[in-house]
Amino acid sequence: MALYEHVFLARQDIAPQQVDELLKTYKNVIESHGGKVERTENWGLRSLAYRIRKNRKAHYVLINIDAPAAAIAEMERQMRINEDILRYITIRVEKHEKEQSAMLSRPDRDDFPGKDEERPRPSRRQYEDVVEGGVE
């Protein structure tokens, strides 16, 4: 059997419990085809780089899998059918990483300090005065 890393993105408007149910469903698909899920990581709700199907955020989930190709094909087929899955990618790897992934240790773009603070912005009149070279 081959080793795979699989990441899928679920819609932002579903509850975290529904994401866990999706994970459980795909885990059962893998196990029913003779594979096993070695590790899962739920990266939580994160911002997307661009909108996907009108979603600006998504629930990210990583699955480390040891399974035959038929199990992966069936899981991907079911993901294509499910409307809650925005994107997925499966990559074959030589070995699985033992420590937690870099995504878990990296803060989300929304977590940076000062993001929600409003910065003072000059009014249009103040801006025009600065551009013209003189301040009244």
UniProtKB/Swiss-Prot annotation:
Compositional bias (Basic and acidic residues): 97-128
Any GO BP: translation
Keyword Ribosomal protein among record annotations: yes
Entry-linked Gene3D superfamilies: 3.30.70.60
Organism: Bartonella bacilliformis (strain ATCC 35685 / KC583 / Herrer 020/F12,63)
GO function term, MF aspect, one: structural constituent of ribosome
Domain of life, source organism: Bacteria
Alphabetical list of Pfam families matching this protein: Ribosomal_S6
Record's keyword terms, sorted: Ribonucleoprotein, Ribosomal protein, RNA-binding, rRNA-binding
Protein family (similarity comment): Belongs to the bacterial ribosomal protein bS6 family.
CDD domains named among the record's database cross-references: bS6
Entries under HAMAP family matching the protein: Ribosomal_bS6
Name of the molecule in the record: Small ribosomal subunit protein bS6
Region (Disordered): 97-136
Signal peptide stretch: none
Coiled coil: none
